[in-house]
Amino acid sequence: MSAPRVSFVSLGCPKALVDSERIITSLRSEGYEISRKHDGADLVIVNTCGFLDSARDESLDAIGLALNENGKVIVTGCLGAEPDVIRERHPNVLAITGPQAYESVMSAVHEAVPPAHDPFVDLVPPQGVKLTPRHYAYLKISEGCSNRCSFCIIPALRGDLVSRPIDSVLREAEKLVNAGVKEILVISQDTSAYGLDIKYQEAMWQDRTVRTKFLDLSRELGDMGVWVRMHYVYPYPHVDEVIPLMAEGKILPYLDIPFQHASPAVLKNMRRPAHQEKTSRRIQAWRETCPDLAVRSTFIVGYPGETEEDFEILLDWLDEAKIERAGCFKYEPVKGAKANDLGLEQVPEEIKEARWHRFMAKQQQISTNLLKKKVGKRLPVIIDEANGTIGKGRTRYDAPEIDGSVHIQSRRPLRVGDIVTVKIEASDAYDLHGIAV
């Protein structure tokens, strides 16, 4: 009897990708095969995103495609928290579960397509099945979020903060390193709040006591001999404690902090505690400790109540802070978000669009000027793509998929996952160009 085959669709953020990896690891450990195509598979699982209307539409379309091409579909993920929405559009799905419901997903799979007898558990690698390239992996340290930003429905979808004990996280990281992973990307909904919900619970790791805390996690990961990159860091004061580890080279000099805006009025409406003057001073202090630091952030323009003055404050903040990487989103109303009940004036779509373009032009100018300063330097670069002596990689200041790249020429063949020294010869708005030395 051949093993049952399951096709898998993973939508949304890196946190959802980790959920998908866990489900696929469970499937493989029970003898299921993973199919790249819906047609011919015994079942399709769709891990959905439900944060923005555009993401909900994409998820519903993916479910429809799976039903058309296969017919047997199990839905999980954030949109699964709203089963009525899914059933209204697609009444024939086999089962619907919410996010992080790994056991419920597996139960639904067992009911629809029972596993083959005597699965070969040893076919599953110790680090589990990963959907990223072999040389980097996402490490999820917690679920949920206890903040109540008015534009966000993550707490409603994924619940309040639930931190993984630090020994569990470090064991997973160790398995990843032993499997050859060269870069670990730490993710959660609120990385710097790690351990707060369990009162920074202590655990034993390598014969010493460590706390379930952002600082301890950073220090221990920094001793594993790989690149460690911190994502989704909320700007709490204790983030300052981690900057010296970056200056020492323990973890990458990179902070992904979603500031969202700079206007005090908009931040208040967003229920975000940060203030533009304080964040500017914080960034300046971080750079004094670690001059090599790169800051990435995301911002929302066109938030309800945002005035031209508010937007100008944001542009001025960009000029002052000069962060290395910035993404920008036009505000979309999210069903269930508190922002819908604030009674604020909506920003017209054409103004949102114009502000988005102005923001991107401003940040492009800043990025271009900062990257010019890299020309002539020799930088370590991790190779993401290689074709003989031509390749593409990333510096310590760039995360995969969301940041810039280094386009490389080399005398010797390049290999994906290698970290090579590159002399930077040129730059443009977002990328660098250089020669491996």
Curated annotation (Swiss-Prot):
Domain MTTase N-terminal positions: 4-114
Gene3D superfamilies noted in UniProt: Methylthiotransferase, N-terminal domain (3.40.50.12160), Nucleic acid-binding proteins (2.40.50.140), tm_1862 like domain (3.80.30.20)
Phylogenetic classification of the source organism: Bacteria, Pseudomonadati, Pseudomonadota, Alphaproteobacteria, Hyphomicrobiales
Cofactor note: Binds 2 [4Fe-4S] clusters. One cluster is coordinated with 3 cysteines and an exchangeable S-adenosyl-L-methionine.
Location(s) in or outside the cell: Cytoplasm
GO BP: tRNA modification
The name this protein goes by in its record: Ribosomal protein uS12 methylthiotransferase RimO
Role played: Catalyzes the methylthiolation of an aspartic acid residue of ribosomal protein uS12.
Binding site for [4Fe-4S] cluster 1: 13, 49, 78
Sorted UniProt keywords: 4Fe-4S, Cytoplasm, Iron, Iron-sulfur, Metal-binding, S-adenosyl-L-methionine, Transferase
Key word Transferase present: yes
Pfam families to which the protein is assigned, alphabetical: Radical_SAM, TRAM_2, UPF0004
Family stated for the protein in its record: Belongs to the methylthiotransferase family. RimO subfamily.
Radical SAM core domain ranges (all copies): 131-369
Binding site for [4Fe-4S] cluster 2: 145, 149, 152
TRAM domain: residues covered: 372-437
